[in-house]
Amino acid sequence: MESHSASKALPLDYIIQHAQTLSKEDIRDDIVGDIYRTSASICKESVQYTNTDKLYRSEKLDKIFTSPIWGFPIMLGILSIIFYLTIAGANVPSDMIAEFFGWAEGYLTSWFQAARAPEWLHGILILGLFRGIGAVISVMLPPMAIFFPMFALLENYGYLPRVAFNMDRLFKRSGAHGKQSLTMAMGFGCNAAAIMSTRIIESPRERMLAILTNNFVPCNGRWPMLILMASLFMAAGYTGSMQTLVTAGVVVGMVVIGVIMTLTVSWVLSKTALKGVPTHYTLELPPYRKPKVWNTIVRATLDKSIYVLKRAIVVAAPAAALTWLLANIFIGDTSLLMYFVNFLDPFAKMLGLDGFILAAFILGLPANEIVIPILLMSYLSTGALTEIDDFNQIKNLFLENGWTWLTALNTMLFSLLHFPCGTTLVNIYKETKSAKWTFLSFAIPTVIAIIVTFLSTQLVHWLGLV
């Protein structure tokens, strides 16, 4: 009886550890492997193939794409090519769209003047709202129209499941679920949608890990900031295709930092607040298929690009108008925006930023897409959003306000690591039904962004590089 009572009192962790010693850790993989080999043997004996090269093509490709040696370099190479094409292909369309909005703004301004509309009304609607919408469309639409279709082509071809297979090993070591790699991949498009995609993870603990760390993957709203900073400062000493290549390399480096941070935070949480044993799952690798290129491009453009752009415009319009009001309502000789900026400036300087940058991130909480327009508007003495059609003009504006390469680096790091946008936070609350976890999803990346930028600033100054 005493022995029976003692066994009843055994802690759950001990029982799990004891059960794991009774079988190999990869027994599930062994079972699935045996099933696959038996099925292949039966097919080989009973089915005749006229084209054996096509039969084994998937296996030959998988040996390369899922190789422990070549899998990750190929993955980074493909990602670099996507970013290179996105950056190189988006420049001209962005300039054309910006010029169109500048032309339209002139006509609208003439119409307001002819109608003798009040200056404040023209300021809110044209210099604030209309320019804000124009900035968002010109900066976001061309990259999205290139990035999303290419990403969709990889998905339809069957490559993304191979990426998940490669990442599964890393996520398992960090205490997370392998399916988190799929939700992380979706975060490249939109973190808010990626939060909903975490439903594919059955374990509540591992699903919470995916929710809390998904923000470290840069979404489409943060690509413009990363690309702009990388091209203006990190690739400043290069021209032509080399500048584009360096810019793409820096952006890929930021993505790698985001993935490392995802794995690190997942590991820490799995050892502290979200303790548990990682669950196993079998990832089915579909055969490689030739994608329907035109259909994929059209669907990706309409379903993803236009949807994200529409959401950005809906959020950017009122935010741009609000920023114009803050910049043009004065108490004495100082605008409300400048009071806010001056309040933030001492703390922001510790992070290698300034009050304008930190204010732009805070006011850009509704959507990351509007951080750049708000930042540019805040720097201008006129208090109006500027057109984003001349990168040299933008760089000169930054340099006049004391920017260095360290400022650009910390702006990129803060953009990569800081709190989720408003839409993502709403989705997190809907999925978790918990104010506590929603707050933690805001606080964890924010604290990490502050620590990382602070340390990078202190290190660079200590080394005397700035």
Model feature map: region roles:
Residues 133-163, 167-194, 316, 346-380:
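Hydrophobic alpha-helical transmembrane segments of multi-pass integral membrane proteins
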Residues 30, 91-115, 119-132, 174, ...:
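Extended, low-charge hydrophobic alpha-helical regions
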Residues 98-100, 154-173, 197-214, 235, ...:
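Juxtamembrane helix-loop transition segments at the membrane interface in multi-pass membrane proteins
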Residues 189-194, 213-230, 249-262, 366-372, ...:
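Membrane-embedded alpha-helical segments of transport systems
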Residues 1-51:
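Alpha-helical transmembrane helix bundles of large polytopic membrane transport and channel proteins
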Residues 224-250, 426-434, 455-465:
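Transmembrane helix-loop junctions at the membrane interface of multipass transporters and ion channels
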Residues 103-107, 111, 161-193, 275-300, ...:
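Juxtamembrane inter-helical linkers in multi-pass membrane proteins
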Residues 58-63, 67-155, 247-358, 439-466:
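Selected transmembrane alpha-helices and immediately adjacent juxtamembrane segments
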